[in-house]
Amino acid sequence: MTSHWLFQLALLAIVVGWLVGAYNRLVRLRNAIVTAWEQIVAALVRRSDAMTAVAAAVREPLAAEAATLQALAEADAKLRTAADGVRQSRGRIADVSLWVTAEAALSSPASRLRALIELQPALLAEPPHGEQLAPALAAWREAEPRIQFARQGFNDAVDRYNRAIHQWPTRLVSMLFRFRPGGRV
């Protein structure tokens, strides 16, 4: 009778130990998503600051394009809001989708502004504007690959997490503690 009771206790300890280990693994993977997202946010802030500097440098010479500059500022603000939503939800699919939509909405005014600057190379040569514009454009160009690299890291973290919550027997823990799939960008 005593050995039967000890066997059950040992089995229970093994199951509880596995549950704790599986739960901690899922939490660690979910936290890796948050960390990877912070890398994207850091790159987005760099790009946003660079775009703001570019817009400020060309605001006067491109006064006729005030609508483009305004659209860029609004799209950037929406992107930052969406990025905060992803951070708070820890990569929930719906919030990631909103961010992807905001990123796509930013591309049009950003591309238009870049095209306007390329069509007017004198902007870079003019002393008051060119001195501010050249470093801001360089920072903007440098930010884009950083964002792509950070997105890849985020997607890798999401893939590892999603695989873990769908694999048997960890699937039981993910259902029990309501771990939800993460979204890719």
Sequence positions of predicted segments:
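A helix-centric hydrophobic-segment signal that preferentially recognizes long
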Residues: 2-185
